[in-house]
Regions:
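Phosphate- and other anionic-substrate recognition elements at nucleic-acid/protein interfaces
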Residues: 1-167
């Protein structure tokens, strides 16, 4: 099973593709989509959408795992994150990829074993789990952590037992 993990952001969106065959997990690709504040926000959202469609059309993942939205103190940041997240979700729907959502707590527990783990702890554990020496940034390691979380849950079932959006 090929899983695309995504950590959406309005400036940097991380992604990671993991393949699980029996009990072996292989990292296929990872990286990030970077935007600059110099271009209008709607163009940044469009860039995220186009890049995600390109990644999904190239690799054809079966599932996409994405972090569920969380409460932020800065409402403007929350709105921008929501737009970036929507671009990723719409790309997945357009490409026919099943969507699964996980809370930050679920992701941290799946990777580190502790729900209040720091970005540094997640980054280090992802490198150990996947045997990758140089993951470029926290956005990418968070995306890979989200994919790891999904692979752990999908061994049993998703947290709700269903893909996101299906009742």
């Amino acid at each position: 099973m090929l899983v695309l993990g995504v950590d959406p952001g309005s400036r940097v969106t991380g992604y990671g593709l993991l393949e699980k065959d029996n009990n072996k997990v292989t990292c296929i690709d990872y990286g990030h989509i970077r935007s600059t504040a110099k271009i209008p926000f709607y163009e940044r959202v469009h860039k995220i959408f186009l890049a995600m469609v390109e990644i999904m059309n190239h690799y054809h993942p079966h599932d996409m795992a994405i972090e569920d939205i969380f409460y932020a103190k800065n409402i403007q940041s929350s709105f921008k994150l929501g737009h970036a997240r929507a671009a990723v979700l719409i790309a997945a729907v357009q490409c026919g990829v099943q969507i699964f959502e996980y809370t930050p707590l679920q992701i941290k527990k799946a990777v580190v074993g502790y729900g209040r783990a720091s970005k540094e702890q997640i980054h280090s554990m992802v490198q150990v789990i996947l045997n990758i020496k140089n993951i470029p940034d926290f956005d990418t390691s968070d995306a890979l952590a989200t994919a790891i979380c999904h692979l752990n849950w999908s061994t049993f079932e998703s947290p709700t037992g269903k893909p996101s959006g299906k009742k």
